[in-house]
Amino acid sequence: RDLHSFPTRRSSDLNGGMDARTKVQVGPEYRPITSEYLDYDEVLDKYDKMMDWLARVYVRTLNVIHYMHDKYYYEAAEMALIDTDVRRTFATGIAGFSHVVDSLSAIKYAKVKTVRDENGVVVDFETEGDFPRYGNDDDRADEIAVWLLKTFMAQDRKSTRLNSSHHGM
């Protein structure tokens, strides 16, 4: 599974940084959510903290990738042909964005019950009721999407970029 996938992060947030499938600690360890039904504010607090950690890991990983591109000459020949000041950009992205918006929307506007394994690890969810979904022109879901994007970008911008690149998404 993709460590940088937002839905994967959401799952490990609920389990105190542990991956539900592998039972391996994949993020910072902290107290898992133990309630039967998910509370929006509690989930958002843990998700925000996990996103902050994830943004740092993500940028460090991309810095290594960009450094290796520079080191092994992938773009050096092309860059030599540019006769002006180069404005470097550093693009990041959010895998699973709509899934997380929908998940947070379900927690906020419906009732989401956790399904746990024999060890108490959240492995699934049961949603009772309806909730606004991303991409359906509903301001309630859009507000969650805007919060998610702004929050992640603010956390993302805290990290130093290779070659003083400009932030992008």
Please state what every model-predicted region is:
Residues R1, S5, R9-R133:
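Structured mid-domain segments that build the active-site/substrate or prosthetic-cofactor binding neighborhood
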Residues K49, V59, N63-D70, Y74, ...:
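Gly/Pro-rich turn-and-neighbor structural signature
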Residues D2-T8, K158, L162-M169:
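Single conserved hydrophobic/aromatic residue that forms the stacking wall/gate
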